């Protein structure tokens, strides 16, 4: 708006603009010095005219008179140009705010509404922000429709010419971690630690947990009374089976627990080279590997 005013009245017009976003109103004011002899009508006003316009003020020469300018004097084309420029600037500010906001929320769970479902992407709205859930970040068995509520984790935020691109995920391991953090207070408080996660999203997950307090069973705390905590997570993940494994300082015990329900005949562990060879009967091999190699 100042560009239009300066173009119409000059750069030194002593004008100010107030924009009321809630009401969609624009107010333009021009400060003029009150004089006896008018030389510059843009910057000055005669004492007689000032007192006539606002007799209650009783102006004197040298005072400042604030004139209210009707935006319509600039013409429809100029006003439309100003509106377009203002709207563009408003969008730029909004995009910057969204980028800054979600850049600080990477790794957090957010809840939005499905806006559009495409073959390779699901677009989610949260207030003014649009989030993209790519196919590879989805749980393959899930189907969503426009208007559905959906919980995801913010994975990354990038800038492109159209504005911030916010990528979210439901298949990421950290999504499972945050779900446990939400449902198990002992994890949020740091009493129980999740050491590792292996997932085949929507099918099966295995997590290794450790308690910092010997009095608290980490597996029992994660499962909850009558399975209340773990079932809340399983339902959110479309009945994904979740195995919770108690950590052990002994490699043989930990590996055997991780390979369950398969039972190895023998284990050959090289702690220095950090690898293990496990032997199984043929009928146990498929269970040992797990769907998608989740046990490996």
Where are these regions (language model features)?
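RNA-contacting regions in translation and RNA-metabolism proteins
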Residues: 1-295
């Amino acid at each position: 708006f100042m560009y239009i005013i300066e173009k119409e009245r000059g750069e030194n017009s002593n004008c100010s603009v107030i924009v009321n976003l809630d009401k969609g109103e624009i107010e333009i004011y021009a400060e003029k010095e009150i004089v006896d002899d008018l030389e510059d009508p843009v910057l000055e006003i005669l004492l007689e005219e000032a007192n006539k316009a606002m007799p209650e003020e009783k102006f004197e020469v040298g005072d400042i008179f604030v004139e209210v300018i009707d935006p319509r004097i600039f013409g429809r084309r100029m006003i439309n140009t100003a509106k377009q420029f203002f709207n563009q600037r408003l969008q730029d500010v909004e995009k910057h705010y969204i980028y800054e906001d979600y850049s600080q929320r990477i790794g957090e769970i957010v809840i939005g509404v499905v806006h559009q479902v495409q073959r390779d992407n699901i677009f989610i709205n949260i207030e003014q922000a649009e989030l993209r859930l790519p196919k590879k970040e989805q749980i393959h068995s899930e189907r969503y429709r426009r208007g559905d509520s959906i919980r995801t984790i913010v994975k990354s935020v990038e800038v492109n010419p159209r504005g911030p691109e916010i990528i979210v995920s439901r298949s990421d391991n950290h999504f499972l971690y945050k779900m446990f953090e939400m449902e198990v207070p002992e994890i949020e408080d740091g009493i129980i630690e999740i050491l590792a996660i292996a997932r085949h999203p929507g099918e099966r997950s295995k997590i290794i947990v450790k308690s910092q307090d010997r009095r608290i069973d980490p597996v029992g705390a994660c499962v909850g009374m009558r399975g209340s905590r773990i079932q809340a997570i399983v339902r959110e993940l479309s009945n994904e089976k979740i195995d919770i494994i108690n950590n052990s300082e002994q490699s043989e015990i930990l590996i055997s627990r991780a390979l369950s329900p398969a039972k190895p005949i023998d284990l050959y562990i090289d702690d220095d080279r950090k690898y293990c060879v496990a032997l199984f009967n043929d009928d146990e091999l498929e269970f040992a590997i797990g769907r998608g190699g989740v046990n490996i």
